[in-house]
Swiss-Prot record:
It is found in: Cytoplasm. Pathway: Amino-acid biosynthesis; L-histidine biosynthesis; L-histidine from 5-phospho-alpha-D-ribose 1-diphosphate: step 4/9. It comes from Bacillus cereus (strain AH187). Belongs to the HisA/HisF family. This is 1-(5-phosphoribosyl)-5-[(5-phosphoribosylamino)methylideneamino] imidazole-4-carboxamide isomerase. GO terms for cellular component: cytoplasm. NCBIfam families: 1-(5-phosphoribosyl)-5-[(5-phosphoribosylamino)methylideneamino]imidazole-4-carboxamide isomerase. One of its GO terms (molecular function) is 1-(5-phosphoribosyl)-5-[(5-phosphoribosylamino)methylideneamino]imidazole-4-carboxamide isomerase activity. Keywords: Amino-acid biosynthesis, Cytoplasm, Histidine biosynthesis, Isomerase. Its EC number is 5.3.1.16.
Length: 239
């Protein structure tokens, strides 16, 4: 299982939100580059970064910070948030990003998604963020009428190989992942799944590992030390 420490960027800082609410942010580190180095130092093999400002604006607004992170660490970095054009995708790859996560564009711009998957194949990940089972977009501010299962099926048909699934109600809560929704996803698609939202303990990670979930994104639990990064990396290596 892959472990992805999370860095959420807002106004150039590393923050955490509660249930996706921008009004409920906590600054975890004023220096995201330093935070990335900390994660790498403690053994992280890859990083998950979200440009929260970009997710709302529809374009990358923390590109310079992302570039500095990519230059500061030697591990692969995947980035999502506001990536809705081929130019944005190419810019991220040009500054050293390993994989790009598309969210809103996956729902509303299928030709763009199909083109990027054709060009970059496994380098393109789709992020599906769900609120009460329906896909939320544009920084989680809009909730669509399409279910997360239906969108996942569409993504698989297009050729998407990896999906990041987030239950927004769990995000930043340390309440545990939404195992039921993840199990339903597994029954409906064969894509690799990365679970995000609510991960609070080593036991949560072990549960997802037992389900053969490909990867887990861990944010708040690392910052609040309910999960030790070195320990969780060792545990998943032994499983």
């Amino acid at each position: 299982m892959e472990i992805f420490p999370a860095i959420d960027l807002k106004e150039g800082r590393c923050v955490r939100l509660y249930q996706g609410e921008f009004s409920k942010e906590t600054v975890m580190n004023e220096d995201p580059v330093a935070q990335a180095i900390i994660f790498e130092t403690f053994g992280a093999k890859r990083l998950h970064i979200v440009d929260l400002d970009g997710a709302v604006a529809g374009e990358s607004l923390n590109l310079s910070v992302i570039e500095r992170i990519c230059k500061a660490v030697r591990i692969p970095v995947q980035v999502g948030g506001g990536i809705r054009s081929l130019v944005s995708v190419e810019k991220l790859f040009s500054v050293g990003v390993d994989k790009v996560i598309l969210g809103t564009a996956a729902l509303y711009d299928k030709p763009f998604l199909e083109e990027t998957v054709r060009l970059y194949k496994e380098k393109i990940i789709v992020g599906i963020d769900a609120k009460n089972g329906f896909v939320a977009t544009r920084g989680w501010l809009d909730v669509s009428e399409i279910s997360y299962i239906d969108l996942a099926k569409q993504m698989e048909k297009i050729g998407v190989q990896t999906i990041v699934f987030t239950d927004i109600s769990k995000d930043g809560t340390l309440a545990g992942p939404n195992v039921e929704q993840l199990e339903l996803l597994q029954k409906n698609v064969a894509t690799r799944l990365i679970a995000s939202g609510g991960i609070a303990s080593i036991q949560d990670v072990k549960k997802l590992n037992d389900m053969n979930i490909y990867g887990v994104i861990i944010g708040k639990a690392l910052y609040e030390k309910t999960i030790d990064l070195e320990e969780v990396l060792e545990v998943t290596k032994l499983c």
